[in-house]
A protein has these predicted regions:
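Residues that define the transmembrane beta-barrel architecture of outer-membrane proteins
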Residues: 31-35, 65-69, 99-103, 131-135, ...
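Transmembrane beta-strands of outer-membrane beta-barrel pores
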Residues: 53-59, 77-79, 86-92, 111, ...
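Repeated loop/turn-to-beta-strand initiation elements of outer-membrane beta-barrel proteins
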Residues: 43-51, 79-84, 113-117, 147-151, ...
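Detector for outer-membrane/organellar transmembrane beta-barrel domains
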Residues: 110, 114-157
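Start-of-domain marker
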Residues: 28-85, 90-92
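Ordered, amphipathic secondary-structure segments that act as subunit-interaction surfaces
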Residues: 94-118
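Outer-membrane beta-barrel "beta-signal"
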Residues: 107, 173-179, 205-217
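Bacterial Sec-dependent N-terminal signal peptides
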Residues: 1-33, 217
Length: 217
């Protein structure tokens, strides 16, 4: 059984490496680095506080494209977790720096140690355009083979104004550091964004190398 899992991990690592190689050589103009730092801790048995910071660096423009802070509280009921959060985003568009404020509700359900689903309902308060609701649905699957080294796969779709506007697919590794509250999660992410005009619908693609640093108390 262990040999079978080891074979699967080798294939996943090979795919991850090939994706990264393809991005690095072929798609520099659509390549970004995302860094995430989040910290969470329980204040009671079923109540958790969380803070997150993320930035996105664009190699196309050689600058930080956007950053955000996100904080809130979640409550766990058996396999269901409900959370209320607030996000503040700053993004560069051409020569301007614009802001967006985004309260959101999260509903997560953990079926087992491998499969988890999350639904997010967010209200986008934009500086330069109309405010709008957006819905996000993410499925996560992990191979829990060892205690501190587990590959994972995620797919998240974004729906706004009854249309699919974005899709994110990611493949990575969850690394736990023994005897500490720290985790490191490097991953490759492919993001597809809908581009619509009066008569046509097109999609643009962004390749991302994402590294997340997590602390859980």
């Amino acid at each position: 059984m262990k040999e079978k899992y080891f074979f699967v991990i080798r294939k996943l690592l090979l795919i991850f490496f090939l994706f990264f190689l393809f991005v690095d050589v072929k798609s520099q103009t659509n390549f970004e680095n995302w860094s995430v730092f989040d910290i969470a801790g329980k204040v009671k048995n079923n109540i958790e506080l969380k803070f997150e910071y993320k930035n996105k660096y664009s190699h196309e423009n050689s600058q930080l494209r956007s950053s955000h802070v996100d904080f809130g509280v979640s409550y766990k009921i058996n396999k269901l977790t409900i959370g209320g959060f607030y996000r503040e985003i700053y993004e560069r568009k051409k020569e301007s720096r614009v802001s967006e404020f985004r309260p959101h509700l999260d509903f997560s359900y953990k079926f087992n140690d491998n499969l988890k689903l999350r639904f997010r309902n967010e209200y986008r308060i934009k500086e330069l355009s109309d405010n709008a609701f957006r819905f996000r649905f993410r499925s996560s699957y992990s191979l829990n083979i060892w205690d501190n080294f587990n590959p994972f796969f995620q797919n998240e779709i974004f729906i706004s104004k009854k249309q699919l506007v974005r899709d994110r697919v990611s493949l990575g590794i969850n690394i736990k550091i023994n005897n500490t509250p720290f985790k490191i999660k490097p991953s490759y992410l492919l993001e597809a964004n809908r581009k619509s005009s009066e008569n046509t619908v097109d999609w643009s693609y962004r390749h991302v190398l994402l590294i997340a640093f997590n602390i859980r108390f």
